């Protein structure tokens, strides 16, 4: 079995659930739930693109789709505004032109919301077609969008660059969370915030449903934290203050973490 990335040992790791012929294990010391054998990157990314037919259709439509021409656009923008308001309420002081990086920015609704309030925005999104309408609509930020893994993109940013970094429903996808979160810490400004929503490995569903828990997706959700072990992990990386909040919406037992550098 793989070692727990927080406790740095495999001695405390035990079987948890078997999903789609893959084993999830759990650390008996800290409670981290994780996929024991992570598939190669090409297998993981195939899960994100939705398969050949869906990917082909998305590539065909993307050059013609407008930023607002998506299903449930108003609801998506309302959700982005709720997240933006929550995050900015946690950040008391800001420079004149603050910088916001959204990892896993999807179609760019949160970035559009921040841009409308004067932020300089940057995004990381593995599926490039999703962000093309945003890039056409917000041409001034078109070159701030990166279609790579964050672990590969982060080397392009200087230390102490961002006032806020968000990762909504993302950190569970990280293949190497220690490298990814270390990169996030490095490029945050002193006093900057990292805001993440992620499935809660201590949620009631984790015990009552186990393999039927919707958060268990072995090609996508590779590491499932809980509040206690995520706080330990964040402090190992240097974050000085970690707070937890209810999720932005109820889904499979999520939590929201706010970490301050």
What are these regions (language model features)?
Residues 21, 174, 221-224:
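Short, solvent-exposed loop/helix junctions and linker helices
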Residues 169, 173:
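A short His-aromatic
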Residues 233-239:
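A structural motif corresponding to the C-terminal end of an alpha-helix
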């Amino acid at each position: 079995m793989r070692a727990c990335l927080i406790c740095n040992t495999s001695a405390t790791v035990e079987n948890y659930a078997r999903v789609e012929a893959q084993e999830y294990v759990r650390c008996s010391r800290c409670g981290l739930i994780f996929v024991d054998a992570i598939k190669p990157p090409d297998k993981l990314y195939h899960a994100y693109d939705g398969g050949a037919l869906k990917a082909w259709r998305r590539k065909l439509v993307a050059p013609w789709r407008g930023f607002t021409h998506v299903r449930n656009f108003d609801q998506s923008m309302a959700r982005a505004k709720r997240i933006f308001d929550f995050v900015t309420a946690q950040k008391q002081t800001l420079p004149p032109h603050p910088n916001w990086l959204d990892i896993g920015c999807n179609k760019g609704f949160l970035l559009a919301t921040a841009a409308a309030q004067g932020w300089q925005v940057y995004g990381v999104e593995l599926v490039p077609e999703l962000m093309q309408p945003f890039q056409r609509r917000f041409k001034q930020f078109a070159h701030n969008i990166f279609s790579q893994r964050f672990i590969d993109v982060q080397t392009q940013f200087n230390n102490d660059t961002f006032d806020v970094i968000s990762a909504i429903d993302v950190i569970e996808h990280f293949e190497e969370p220690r490298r990814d979160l270390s990169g996030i810490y490095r490029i945050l400004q002193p006093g900057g915030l990292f805001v993440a929503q992620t499935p809660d490995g201590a949620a009631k569903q984790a015990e009552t449903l186990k393999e039927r828990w919707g958060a268990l997706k072995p090609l996508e959700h590779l590491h499932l934290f809980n509040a206690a072990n995520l706080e330990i992990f964040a402090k190992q990386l240097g974050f000085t203050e970690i707070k937890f909040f209810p999720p932005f919406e109820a889904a499979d037992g999520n939590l929201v973490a706010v970490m301050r550098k």
